[in-house]
Amino acid sequence: MSAAIRENELLIRACILYESLDDKPIAESYKNFCRKVGKDIMTLHDFDYWFYRFHNGNHDLYHDRSKDPKPKSLSDFPIGVMYDVLGHVDPFERLVLRKVSRNLRDVVQKMRCELDALYVNKENTCISIGFGQGTITYSQVDNGCQVDQWKSSSGYKKKFVEGGDFMELFNTDFRTLLENKKVILNSFDVHHYLLARNGTNEEQFLDHLIEIIKSSNKFTTRSFGIGDLSFDKIARFLELMEPKSLEKLEIGNIIGSTDYDHLVNTEQWKTLKHFISECVEISIPIDHLLHFTTMKVDLTELTVHDALKIRDMLDTSETFDYAMIYVKMTDPIEVARVFNPEYNNDDNQNRLFYYTNPGNKKFAIGSSKSMLSISDLASDYFAD
């Protein structure tokens, strides 16, 4: 295409008019236009304007676009309309829309937002936020931060923030997400790695995370999972969560102090229904575990005296369903005989027997030298 045509606005519009009359999809028409006229002549946004204007019968090549009525943005619509539209927007898009205008931010903050799952994952100089439908990943690279967004519905989008710091960008977006007081989570999980090996700004990351959650005032989630921390830091996280809403805690490896006193004295711990600490031995006394509806735990020890406390709990609890306790018992037969005086297991294999409490509620009990399981026969957790 000659330079004369490329610099003549009317001729360029005539080329678009020709494409609009060819009755092809706009994507194909734009590709053909770029091949003939040049890729740098017009953006798809501007091509779209003229293409559909001509396609709808408005063939005036001299039309002054600047005199068109200013198109309304979403934030110009009545509040009721904005609520209807934003009700169909996913968490990714709400995060972006909050930054568009004060009106949109105010509406998004007032809308109930229930997420099935939210997780934060940190590994060295990379942090991800996962919403279930996809992820946003912040990676520190040369001269800035690479932000990658993946959604199951639309695939990948990438953005480079020159001079950006991955942790600062994460902190900003995560804080923005939690500013909505009506965000309700079914589960929230924090994963972080390499703390035990090199501690690369892990403490700073965790402290920022605690500060952001704390600033959200009332952080509501039904389930919380975290690991590679001390009991004390886990307690600091728990204290930020609404105790009446938090039902389940799952912890991974314990690093640092194993002093459990702070943890077991939080209101959140005392009102938990479900607790999991598989694959990590904990030294929390059995007294602090007996209020759970279900639990799967690795304990450092389980004595006959502990078994008596468990039996007393079975005799009175109206909420207990299931317990799986992994432990290397020094006297497994005597522990089992707390529930069945005639129990005998010479080969130390897992044996199933039953215990009936004074209220005639029946429990299935499995016992071996390394495990004790208890199930209420009326609960969904029991299986033959």
Swiss-Prot record:
A Pfam family this chain is assigned to: FTH
Chain ranges of the F-box domain: 71-122
Recorded family membership: Belongs to the FTH family.
Protein name, entry field: F-box A protein 224
Organism (species): Caenorhabditis elegans
Gene for this chain: fbxa-224
